[in-house]
Swiss-Prot record:
Name this polypeptide is given: Putative [LysW]-aminoadipate/[LysW]-glutamate kinase
Record's keyword annotation contains Amino-acid biosynthesis: yes
Leader sequence segment: none
Positions of the record's site feature: Transition state stabilizer: K10, K222
Species of origin: Pyrococcus horikoshii (strain ATCC 700860 / DSM 12428 / JCM 9974 / NBRC 100139 / OT-3)
UniProt entry keywords in alphabetical sequence: Amino-acid biosynthesis, Arginine biosynthesis, ATP-binding, Cytoplasm, Kinase, Lysine biosynthesis, Nucleotide-binding, Transferase
EC number(s) given by UniProt: 2.7.2.17, 2.7.2.19
NCBIfam families noted in UniProt: argB, PRK14058.1-2
Name of the top EC class for this enzyme: transferase
């Protein structure tokens, strides 16, 4: 398997409004960008008076319950984030191209049920529109790369149910990195990996699991994706925040 010298960058929703503070033009050239948008979703839901329930998985990861109404808000919000990120990159001289999962770049399958811990019990929820990523349309992404830097929204398309899906941006970035055989997966977040308030500069590839107990929420998810990416052939994973960077290799 030949891995290519390009990177996949995940721009977290938490840094979209502060991107100029962490923006480095050299890392965005010859790259594919994936982004989040949680803040945008929360803001739009609040504006519309829609209550968005936050749940916790049995593994301790917090996620948004995506009903059909929440899905509509989610798509509108992350596409707004997509437009703003593309606009920012173009102002910096990067020929960015907005890409939506609705255009079948990310193929997914709607989860038949999701599990959440509610009142101390593991419950099954079936009315959810979140998805599992099944396939990345490599040919379509490479065609976009011929003319610029693709900026991919975290939306998948389920061809069986003919519906768009809420998919996690970190997982999209991981799957895109593997599909494109990228050497580097780069997370731009609000913070690097911390222990007791101190940035951990390096994590050896064979010791990632040792750091799991010191992580939670979105950072736990990033470490999980980093472990899977390294095990699958990605050479290094970087978590860069406003306070420094953590290199996993």
């Amino acid at each position: 398997m030949r891995w290519v010298s390009m990177r996949v960058i995940k721009v977290g929703g938490s840094v979209l409004e502060n991107l100029e503070k962490v923006f480095k033009p050299e890392i965005f050239r010859d790259a594919v960008v994936v982004h989040g948008g949680s803040r945008y979703v929360d803001e739009l839901a609040k504006k519309l008076g829609l209550n968005v329930e936050k749940l916790t998985s049995p593994s301790g990861v917090t996620f948004r319950r995506t009903t059909r109404k929440v899905l509509d808000v989610y798509i509108a919000a992350v596409m707004k984030a997509n437009r703003e990120l593309v606009s920012f990159l173009r102002r910096q001289g990067i020929e960015a191209i907005g890409v939506s999962g609705v255009k079948e770049v990310i193929i997914g399958r709607r989860k038949k049920l999701i599990k959440a811990v509610i009142n101390g019990k593991i419950m099954a929820i079936r009315d959810d529109y979140s998805g599992i990523i099944k396939e990345v349309n490599v040919e379509m992404i490479r065609n976009y790369m011929k003319v610029g830097v693709p900026v991919i929204a975290p939306i998948a398309y389920d061809p069986v149910e003919n519906v768009p899906l809420n998919v996690d941006g970190d997982k999209v970035a991981y799957h895109v990195a593997l599909a494109l055989k990228s050497r580097e997966l780069y997370f731009l977040s609000d913070t690097a990996f911390l222990i007791n308030g101190e940035v951990i500069d390096k994590i050896p590839r064979n010791r990632i699991e040792e750091y799991f107990p010191y992580s939670s929420g979105g950072m736990r998810k990033k470490l999980l994706m980093a472990k899977k990416a390294i095990e699958s052939g990605v050479e290094r994973v970087i978590i860069e925040g406003l306070n420094g960077r953590t290199v996993i290799s």
